[in-house]
Amino acid sequence: MQSPAMSMVTPIFPIPLKTNSSKKNFYTTFLTPHKLTLCLLIELYAHRIIQPQHCVPFLDLVLGYFNPNDSQPQTLTRIHDITSHLPSSIEEYSVYSLLHERLWSLHSFEDIHEIFISLGNYIEGVYDSEEEAPHMLFSSSSLLSIFLRKCVVEYEQFSFEQGVQFFKSFLQYRAPSMDFQHEGIEFCKINVRHELMNLASNKTLLQLAFGSIPVSRSSRDIEQLTQVQIEHMQKFGCALPLEMKEKLHDLLEVEENNLNTSYYCKFLNSWFSGDYQQSVENLCRYFDHIMHSDEKVSYQYALLNLAMLQADFGCNEEALHAIEDTINTARESGDTACLNFALAWMFEFKRSQYSNPSPEKNENDDQILEHLARNSQKAQLPILQTTVHLLQVQKFLDDGSSLIGVFSNLTKAFALFCANESFDGFPRYMDLLQSIWYRLGCSILSMTYISIYQKNHVHDSPALDLLQSLITKAWRYAELGRWLDVATILSTAEVQSQRSFQCAHLYGREKTFIYLSKAIDEKNHMDATLYLKNLNGFRHDKMSTFRTQLYALRLDISLGNLSQAIEGIDKLLEEPEKLAIEWVLQLMFLKVDIYMRTEMSNRAVFELLEIIQMASSNYLRLYLLRGLCTLCLIGELDCFTAIDLLDSLIPDIIAADNKPLLALAFHAFASLQIKHLDLLQPSRMFVIQLLDSAIDGYRACYMVEMQKTVVRLKIQYLRQINDPALQPNIEQYCSRFYSDNLLN
């Protein structure tokens, strides 16, 4: 007699079977048959079936599915592979043997219902019997208790129809376990309450008896996993079209015992947890399986994932090779959406690697943008049309070629957002808008746009975009000297940083930069050195690598290592094509600082004139204002020319809402008044107010070195006017100056 498990269905049934139909999915929020099986494992653990020395693999197995972002494959095969080697407290039985028996003792929806009703008895505070519990009780705050409660709460919210659907999907999930244990066949013969003996293990007969059997999937697992992947792909500012988002979602929609999906989930899980080696290995296995299956349409998406992975871990050349393969594969397969996105991503990625490109590269970039604009419009892909306009904005800003082009493309991008009622690329748009106004010297408007974005898009924004917005706001508050607000914003950012591995590194790195800058300004060299060392523990992109070098140079200057600092600056400036214009200007300002400290005013003026020319041609108004104020401070300009210049700059400096810049303007104005005291004959009150305003501005930003410079200037002025009544004030200022007690 043929074994029930090995029986084949012959076409004698009057009901036609749909052998090629796609699998129907039954969506839940968290609960799946796999998590029901984990609940049964927790039951065994509570009854001390699992030996203490083997508890760690069991707990790792359960906790691997606690967080929806942990995208482990939800198959009984995985549980079997782990628990079949774990001996139980019952001799000659493995943990899986007892679990297998428990699984096959569930014959109806009522049996599953009883399971969920009884799970609360394993939690302290819920178990209300006066007798001592015959099993272990879990603390109500433990992760196992939380896992059980999440499963029970969702099950209790099922309608009757949903409960039946869940039972059907459980039968589908359990069926493959017939191959794991031969005694399971005999067990099913005796206990299964169906008229057809092999119904429990035969998928075809299950379909005949119950109709279409859905695969139970956790919508939270899929949605969160897809969302995190989309955030990583949009890291360089290129928004994904809707059809690509749907494709990424569909890659996770197939049956969970599908090896392709299993390796794909493992790849994503390793990637998001920061395990580069394991993620590459799982992605290679995914490549192998899709090449030997009928899913070759997914090949360009696998290559796209490879490019994102390599870029995320700093392997830039490998990322460019992978994205070029993606472009070729997408072109061959006719996937216009993937092709255009890959081209846009490559353009943006190359721009981030070569901040000041050569003319030949600029010409090539122009061709890519023209191709993207033409293709996205022809294919009616509004999200990519928007991306092209935003890329044009960034290119105009980098080149400093056309402010009209900047605002023209911003307007077109916003019109597309409104016309299509799709705001997928809106974080990128808002970030560009606030950065443009900041560059133009209108910090108040920049902060307004940041606040609007955070207020209205906090729930639908990608985690990285929202975190970057909070970090930008913290930097703006630091410029205003509002350090209590900085601490508040960083506390909010810390909560957001827990959403992914990349967010955690971004938050930790930027927070360190903020307090490193403050420590250098305070001349707190011990803390600054410690912060600089701590930066080695974070992942860096090209910009953060440069900033680390910049702060190291600032620390050298603060310590008095001027020769070492000037050598480091010249070395960085040897390859200007690798530096953004703003980075070059920051290095040039450091050279000006060194020249002023060593009283080489002619060289300082030469550098400042070049800074002013570069800042003006690239619409970097804050750098322009700072350069002009510093030029006035050095005192090489004609007295009245310098005063007229400062008078004309003050309104723009106030609009910039930048305290160090405003303090510098007051400092320069006071210095001119004191230097030309006989010629200008300013009132004593006017000069002292200028000096005090400069001191207050520097104090708010913890700039100790500049405070000392202004206090020294004030002492010089008070001595110069030679008023005996001011002698106590002079002694007071001298005492503060020499005691370094300038922050009180």
From Swiss-Prot:
Keyword Transmembrane helix: no
Keyword annotations: Cell cycle, Cell division, Mitosis, Ubl conjugation pathway
Pfam families: ANAPC5 (PF12862)
Record's GO cellular component terms: anaphase-promoting complex; nucleus
InterPro entries, alphabetized: Apc5 (IPR037679), Apc5_dom (IPR026000)
A GO BP annotation: mitotic sister chromatid separation
Family membership noted in the UniProt record: Belongs to the APC5 family.
Biological role stated in the UniProt entry: Component of the anaphase promoting complex/cyclosome (APC/C), a cell cycle-regulated E3 ubiquitin-protein ligase complex that controls progression through mitosis and the G1 phase of the cell cycle. The APC/C is thought to confer substrate specificity and, in the presence of ubiquitin-conjugating E2 enzymes, it catalyzes the formation of protein-ubiquitin conjugates that are subsequently degraded by the 26S proteasome.
Quaternary structure and partners: The APC/C is composed of at least 13 subunits: apc1, apc2, nuc2, apc4, apc5, cut9, apc8, apc10, apc11, hcn1, apc13, apc14 and apc15.
The protein's name in its UniProt record: Anaphase-promoting complex subunit 5
Organism of provenance: Schizosaccharomyces pombe (strain 972 / ATCC 24843)
Gene (name only): apc5
